[in-house]
Amino acid sequence: ISAPVHILKADGGTLPLEAALQQPVEAVFTGPAASVLGIEALCAPEVNSISLDVGGTTTDIAFWENGLPLMARKGATVAGYPTAVRAFHMRSIGIGGDSRLHKTENSYVVGPEREGPAAAVGGSIATLSDALITAGYVHFGDEERAQAAIAALGGEPQAEARKIVAAAVEQIKTTIREMLDEWAKQPVYTVNDVIKGTEFIPQQLIGVGGGAPGLIRALGEAMALPVDIPAGAMVANAIGAAVARPTLSAGLR
């Protein structure tokens, strides 16, 4: 194949490879941006929504209002530092289907390390996917292997699995609360912002990615929100990369 190469940007646009080499910072958060574009192509949310792309290692979270993804008003933040790079208002956290499980005195911490394949599909140690299977949120692979891996952590398998899922859900809810607080503290730039305010009240969850069906269902129960997993959700990221288009900006003086 002889074709020009374009790199996805954090705002969902693309730029030529040559330009990306000159401005590599524009390529931050390209994976999460592809997921946002994929969701827009698959379902175009009509109500205020929180989307979550759940992979094996991370979960990418974005907000939607009036069918459009919210943009980070101060640009992308990397490791706590503002970059002024135009980007969606999103956050990536180290929780996914293959996340390692850390047992504490009374609960669990999920991630951020990736353990590897779930026991249900041939792995040797329990992961979040095994907990979701054992707790009945999703069904795939060898469910007996998943239950045995959870049992090896100690305690009754279903009870332990529910603890693990609850811990993952609480970690995600904490991140969502932080994102909501961050958005509410953003400066207002338009008359509409002054009139309506900047408070964002989610009305549904949208799940995409291989780990979405089980985890988003559990999160929806905890947040008392309906859940939408659109057709094609497993490949939303690839769809987003395919529909991306070039974007340009110009400064006027």
Ranges and model annotations:
Residues Q23-S51, D60-R253:
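Helical "lid/coupling" subdomains associated with nucleotide-phosphate turnover
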Residues G56-T57:
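Short acidic, Gly/Ser-rich segments with clustered Asp/Glu that frequently serve as metal-coordination loops
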